[in-house]
Amino acid sequence: YVGQRLCGSQLVDTLYSVCKHRGFYRPSEGIVDQCCTNICSRNQLLTYCN
C-alpha cells in the first residue's frame, strides 16, 4: 500500500491489515484527504488504530 492512494474498501482492508487485533476507529474525512486524495504512509494509517 505504500505509495498508493487508498479509497473505499481498499482503505478499510489496509486499516485492518495495519491495525490487526487492535482494530481502528471510524475515521473522519481526514483519512480520505490523507489516503485517497493524497498518498498516506503506514505511520499515518497507524494513527487511526485503537
UniProtKB/Swiss-Prot annotation:
Q: List the disulfide bonds.
A: C7-C36, C19-C49, C35-C40
Q: What does this protein do?
A: Insulin decreases blood glucose concentration. It increases cell permeability to monosaccharides, amino acids and fatty acids. It accelerates glycolysis, the pentose phosphate cycle, and glycogen synthesis in liver.
How is this protein organized at the quaternary level?
Heterodimer of a B chain and an A chain linked by two disulfide bonds.
Mind telling me what this protein is named? Answer: Insulin
Keyword terms: Carbohydrate metabolism, Disulfide bond, Glucose metabolism, Hormone, Secreted
User: GO cellular component annotations, sorted alphabetically?
Assistant: extracellular region
Localization of this protein: Secreted
Q: Which domain of life is it from?
A: Eukaryota
Pfam families, alphabetized = Insulin
Q: Name one GO molecular function term.
A: hormone activity
- Gene expressing this chain: INS
Taxonomy of the source species: Eukaryota, Metazoa, Chordata, Craniata, Vertebrata
Main subcellular location of this protein, as a coarse class = secreted
InterPro entries reported for this sequence: Insulin-like, Insulin-like_sf, Insulin_CS, Insulin_family
Q: Which organism is it from?
A: Proechimys guairae
Q: Which family is it part of? A: Belongs to the insulin family.
- Any one of the GO BP annotations: glucose metabolic process
